[in-house]
Regions:
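C-terminal-of-GTPase-core extension/linker across diverse P-loop GTPases
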Residues: 2-8, 13, 19, 147-354, ...
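General secondary-structure edge motif
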Residues: 35, 75, 109, 121, ...
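Flexible beta-alpha connector loops of hexameric P-loop NTPases
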Residues: 77-84, 118-133, 152-158, 212-213, ...
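Conserved nucleotide-binding/hydrolysis micro-motifs of P-loop NTPases
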Residues: 25, 51-52, 75-78, 106-112, ...
């Protein structure tokens, strides 16, 4: 099951530098001119989780396999993208294929790095991109409402639901609000997601600050934090320059560097976890002598569907899941001890998997 987060931003905000650090590569050409990223660069990154190596140590696992997320560095956007200006059409098509948006905002002053509008204002930058996404959605909604007219005449239930949801989104957008702020009933949630509107995607604001502000943020990132809180969005503070340096160091050197900078952990780790949380994801583990592995599932997933992430046969032939909570596994010293202590539970098809569960599935082949 793949989860994809698109990294977006105006030209020269540091998003390609950030992508390079995330993926530990120089894949994205981080040049000081608009549109240096034309084709989206795609990178698969490990989700940091201190629980996994602890489980592996207890089980003496020969291999450790973390959960992963996909990040996509998408072409720099400019005002007018919804009308096809700059690389607008390509940008909008690429972002439509992602599950969430990491919006990099320039919160640093640097005379050597040009700003597309000539001055630094992260709130205005955020509004530029949000406006372009909203305009694109409005255009898309108008087209779709026209195309479903015939189905509506025939009383098609799906078309009736789609029209209702499209009009709900249209009302939000015409009021100047992104569609993700609309109140959608649980019964409509799947159909709402299927609309694939750009402004329904959850947003994480990434405040790219100067190196000296990486630990505490600055006045510009504080403004972004207020904006995010008002929108019910998430935000992280990060220095792409620092992360780029850390990406070139080994683990020991990186730890020393972070300590010198007054940072408890790499900003990228916080960014990845924030993206994971934004997408409503959680982790369960399978642990044994061969491997300890983290598996990604949406929150609220039931045991058979969680098993299906490993293999479809596990879901189809699901019998039960032997379950140990992470804290019990660690405090008691492994599967056998947890079982002896009565801390291993047998869960059926209705069980909602919890974050950190250590699971062993039994199924009919």
């Amino acid at each position: 099951m793949g989860f994809k987060m698109g990294i977006v931003g105006l030209p020269n905000v540091g998003k390609s530098t950030l992508f390079n650090a995330l993926t530990r590569t120089a894949a994205a050409q981080a040049a000081n001119f608009p549109f240096c990223t034309i084709e989206p660069n795609v990178g698969d990154v490990a989700v940091p989780d201190t629980r996994l190596p602890r489980l592996a140590g207890i089980a003496k696992s020969r291999q450790v396999i973390p959960a992963r997320m996909t990040f996509v560095d998408i072409a720099g956007l400019v005002q007018g993208a919804s009308r096809g200006e700059g690389l607008g059409n390509q940008f909008l098509a690429n972002i439509r294929e992602t599950d969430a948006i990491a919006h990099v905002l320039r919160c640093f002053e640097d005379g050597d790095v040009t700003h597309v509008d000539g001055h630094v204002d992260p709130i205005a930058d955020a509004e530029v991109i949000e406006t372009e996404l909203m305009l694109s959605d409005l255009e898309s909604i108008e087209r779709r409402l026209q195309t479903i007219t015939r189905k509506l005449r025939g009383g098609d239930k799906e078309a009736i639901q789609q029209e209702r949801l499209l009009k709900l989104a249209q009302e939000m957008l015409e009021a100047g609000k992104p569609a993700r702020l609309a109140e959608v009933a649980d019964d409509d949630r799947k159909a709402w997601t299927m609309l694939q509107l750009l402004t329904t995607k959850p947003v994480l604001y990434v405040c790219n600050v100067e190196e000296g502000a990486a630990a505490t943020g600055n006045a510009q990132s504080a403004r972004v934090a207020e904006m995010a809180a008002a929108q019910g969005a998430a935000h992280v503070v990060i220095s792409a320059r620092i992360e780029e340096e850390i990406a070139q160091l080994d683990a020991e050197e990186a730890a020393l560097f972070l300590d010198e900078m007054g940072l408890e952990e790499a900003g990228l780790d916080r960014l990845i976890r924030a993206g994971y949380d934004l997408l409503g994801l959680q982790t369960y583990f399978t642990v044994g002598p061969k491997e300890a592995r983290a598996w990604t599932i949406p929150r609220g997933t039931r045991a058979p569907q969680a098993a299906g992430v490993i293999h479809g046969d596990f879901e189809r032939g699901f019998i039960r899941a032997e379950t140990i909570a992470y804290d019990d596994y660690v405090s008691l010293g492994g599967e056998a001890a947890a079982k002896d202590a009565g801390r291993m539970r047998v869960e059926g098809k209705g069980y909602e998997v919890k974050d950190g569960d250590v699971l062993h599935f039994l199924f009919n082949a």
